């Protein structure tokens, strides 16, 4: 290769890109795009691991005799899941209660556990806590056959359960009817007045307008 041509190629390789040039902007965009892609990939892997850990717990605590779960049984299983750290928290509290300890040990671990349980409890008592749909017999069978491969998670149908799901519909309806009945009785009882002995009794219906109603006397203190 001629020396002149070789020198030109070396110079071209060492050419510095201007920081405000279009080439520099393109390189910056590609770098940000790659960083975002890696971040999303990491976040997705983390979410899959968390979901996998949760599903492994439910898988290991399934009742092998059941072909499907009722809402009540599924809610009881969720309650057990929300109580899964109770033994560890007791051990941490016991260690912290021992005399001559300087500060609280395992504080970061304790804080993470409590934050996790608080978030899960809010979900369960709010818009719902997601678990495998073990109320469906086919999904339960698929879940039993799961080999803990995270790539197979899309094959497991999920559903949300709330704390209210533990109460049968008939009992809910009965409670609603009782409340409506009590409200109806209150409406039928009409307005009330005050008597000298402090007990309330129906007010007089002799007047029809507010102007004609007798003011309720204020009892002396």
Curated annotation (Swiss-Prot):
Annotated TM spans: none
Alphabetized UniProt keyword annotations: Nucleus, Ribosome biogenesis
Domain of life the protein comes from: Eukaryota
GO biological process entries: ribosomal large subunit biogenesis
Family annotation (InterPro entries): Tma16, Tma16_sf
One Gene Ontology cellular component: nucleolus
Subcellular localization(s) per the UniProt record: Nucleus
Record flagged with keyword Nucleus: yes
Region (Disordered): 180-221
Primary localisation category: nucleus
Pfam families: Tma16 (PF11176)
GO MF term set: preribosome binding
Family membership noted in the UniProt record: Belongs to the TMA16 family.
Subunit structure: Associates with pre-60S ribosomal particles.
Protein's job: Involved in the biogenesis of the 60S ribosomal subunit in the nucleus.
Protein name (database record): Translation machinery-associated protein 16
